[in-house]
């Protein structure tokens, strides 16, 4: 299931961050889940669509697309 959220924060040096989803817990996002060519990064406040999977430490984003 694809959901839409907004990037809460993303650390380019560490390569991860979190996405806010209304009515849900924040979702962890790793740079490897971002669907783009070149440098994979997200900006705070940016809208994204993605799928949620169960990661080792809770919900994790996959197939992240910048909107």
UniProtKB/Swiss-Prot annotation:
Induction: In response to low temperature. One of its GO terms (cellular component) is cytoplasm. This is Major cold shock protein CspA. The gene is cspA. It comes from the Bacteria. Gene3D superfamilies: 6.20.370.130, Nucleic acid-binding proteins. Homodimer. Residues 5-64 form the CSD domain. InterPro entries: Cold_shock_CspA (IPR012156), Cold_shock_domain (IPR050181), CSD (IPR011129), CSD_CS (IPR019844), CSP_DNA-bd (IPR002059), NA-bd_OB-fold (IPR012340). GO terms for molecular function: DNA binding. Can bind to ATTGG and CCAAT motifs (Y-box motifs) of single-stranded oligonucleotides. Pfam families: CSD. It is found in: Cytoplasm. Its main location: cytoplasm. Keywords: Activator, Cytoplasm, DNA-binding, Stress response, Transcription, Transcription regulation. CDD domains: CSP_CDS.
